[in-house]
Regions:
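Conserved ABC ATPase "signature" region
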Residues: 24-28, 121, 125, 132-150
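Conserved ABC transporter NBD signature motif
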Residues: 80-90, 96-97
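Conserved ABC ATPase signature
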Residues: 154-158
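Catalytic Walker B motif of ABC-type/P-loop ATPase nucleotide-binding domains
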Residues: 179-183
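ABC transporter nucleotide-binding domain
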Residues: 197-295
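C-terminal coupling/interaction segments
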Residues: 295-336
């Protein structure tokens, strides 16, 4: 199976104006500005096969939006090789642009003061969609996303959920092979999220649509994606299947530690932290004045309980869902 996306040694560096202190420094910066580099992406390598649905996960500032813009051809990488559907995205070739769609949840491609239908009709002409195909696809999209009564309203009068669903409709009208979704469900109600997730899964089965999805709502990732890529500080930290990610998560538990007698003070917690260093491969994800929380491999739980069974500490294993696991990963990496 040929690859949908190929990235090799991709770097993206921005140059930001240096901060200044004092009037003289500000005037100098105004006349002769100086800049400092900011590495948004560092040696990014991964491949995505055709027909895949990939969840691209990372905290704010991790490099997700920069990478999406590079994959769409909006930005060029500073260095490295990018191939999407066999094309160099930065060349913005017509053959490439006709094969992709892109929805940015915080931006609109619709004309603000005109009815949604006007934007859809215009895109029909831009992409040279046949009348019969246009009517069929528009009918399917409006029925599936509950937009029949919406597309004749001006965009400015739509709710956020209605607007995002109209954006999705616009970007699927020309039947792209690949759609990029950058935070498509941010701020949406439960019903709108469900309709979008359901339709994306339907299109994947019906027309082998490939999906590259970034979202802080991990419910989107769990519902729509088979694979996941996790990025942090511009570097890829995980690239594999959702099943592999679940196996990693199941190998760890969250352990909460507190003092049975709070009058013993922080010194006892400090003693606990020092003692835990012998295990090496555990992460402290919460360091509070009265309790500690660790991400601990399951195989070490029994040994830890045996070590601290003198009645000084309360040890509690806490439940973890997918979102908790991802958040704890980010916390453990931030301390590195």
């Amino acid at each position: 199976m040929s690859n949908l996306i190929d990235l090799t040694a991709v770097n993206k560096c921005y140059f930001l104006a240096r901060e200044t202190v004092g009037l003289a420094a500000w005037c100098k910066q105004l006349v002769k500005p100086s800049y400092e580099p900011y590495q948004a992406l560092a040696d990014v390598n991964f491949t995505v096969p055709k027909g895949a649905a990939v969840g691209f996960i990372g905290p704010n500032g991790a490099g997700k939006s920069s990478l999406i813009k590079i994959l769409c051809g909006i930005q060029k990488p500073t260095s490295g090789t990018v191939r999407v559907l066999g094309h160099n995205p930065s060349l913005r070739e017509k053959g490439f642009l006709h094969r992709i769609g892109a929805v940015f949840g915080h931006k609109t491609s619709l004309w603000w003061d005109l009815p949604v239908k006007t934007s859809l009709d215009t895109y029909k002409e831009i992409y040279k969609i046949k009348d019969v195909d246009y009517r069929k696809r528009l009918s399917e999209l409006t029925d599936s996303l509950n937009l029949s009564k919406v597309i004749h309203k001006p965009v400015r009068n739509l709710s956020l959920g209605e607007r995002v669903k109209c954006e999705l409709t616009l970007n699927l009208l020309h039947s792209p092979e690949l759609i990029f979704l950058d935070e498509p469900t941010v701020g949406l109600d439960v019903t709108s999220k469900y309709e979008i997730r359901k339709y994306l899964n339907y299109k994947r089965k019906e027309s082998n649509l490939s999906v590259f999805l970034t979202s802080h709502d991990l419910g989107d990732i769990e519902s729509c994606c088979d694979d996941a890529i996790i990025i942090d500080k511009g570097r890829i930290r995980f690239d594999g299947s959702m099943r592999d990610l679940s196996i990693i998560f199941k190998a760890n538990i969250k352990l909460n530690v507190s003092l049975q007698d709070l009058t013993l003070g922080e010194a006892r917690l400090l003693r606990f932290k020092e003692a835990m260093k012998v295990f090496g491969n555990i992460s402290l994800i919460n360091d509070g004045p009265t309790n500690l929380t660790y991400l601990v491999p399951k195989v070490l739980v029994g040994e830890i309980f045996d070590m601290f069974n003198d009645g000084t500490y309360d040890l509690e294993v806490l439940p973890m869902d997918f979102e908790n696991n991802v958040v704890n990963l980010f916390k453990s990496w931030s301390s590195e």
